[in-house]
Amino acid sequence: KNILDSSSLDDNRIIIDYYETSPKSSLDFSNNENDITWIQILSGRIDTYYPNTYIPGRRVDDTKIIFIKGTHHVSLDTPKGSSFIVTRIPNYKIHENDANDMYESDLRVVNWGNEPVLKSEHDDRKRVYLLSDSLVGTDSVKGELIVYPQSTSCPEHYHMGAEHYQFITSGSVFAVLDGEEKELNKFDLLYNFENEKHWFYTKDDQCKFVEFFVPGENKTIWTQTTNVCTWSPIGTDIRGKSPSRHIEKHVHGEGKNI
């Protein structure tokens, strides 16, 4: 099921499809030379195979993202059924900060489940980076998992130089865009255009959502300068284990070596 394409946007920077498979299903994906694609598992597990390469197949669960850059073919098996979203950025080089004329080829699994958890200094929200220049070798996209406990909010802000979307993976949250309020529930998608003021809050339910920025490099502007989103590492990954790396405390959008 297609859930976002150029018919909904001002351009074709993001294409998103949702898949739900039955047990023992197989799917094949081909990526073009000038595109990047990532596959995020929402439920179940996927066995991956990479025909005509020396890359070994592996089992992927909902703490990992399959990232494809350039010309590649990927085969997916879902032994017990699965749901996942496939996001593609056509001609990703136009979104890179310092792009060259070379289209790289890369295929990797990002184990974001072992990435460091960051906590907001002003409330109990948590953040985990899913895609970044350090993780996937391009700054054309940046992805994050955001966790909102009950009765939590973020300050109003907007972004210059990028558009982004939120996809709700569990729970519910209220989004306020330019003063208009909308409740979002599991598997809802919200798209934020550049310079569109927005903020979020929860009531009696907690919420988890992923958000992806295109381009990944952009500037966040806070409509009020108090309590801006500052994030500090808590020393564990999302499973409570030691993380794979350290990320320094930073204001959202201003971190280095993310």
Segments predicted by a language model, with ranges:
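Short, solvent-exposed loop/turn positions at domain surfaces
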Residues: 15, 28, 35, 53-54, ...
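Asparagine-centered strand-capping/turn motif at beta-strand->loop junctions
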Residues: 74-79, 200-203
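Short acidic-glycine-tyrosine-enriched beta hairpin
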Residues: 38, 52-71, 179-196
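Extended, compositionally biased flexible segments
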Residues: 28, 33-64, 75-76
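Compact recognition or signaling/catalytic modules
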Residues: 165, 171, 176-187, 197-202, ...
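Short, conserved beta-strand element in jelly-roll/cupin
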Residues: 20-21, 31-48, 145-149, 158-175, ...
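A short hydrophobic beta-strand segment most commonly corresponding to one strand
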Residues: 65, 80-96, 191, 205-223
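A short, N-terminal "cap"/entry segment at the start of jelly-roll beta-barrel domains
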Residues: 1-15, 22-29, 57-62, 81-83, ...
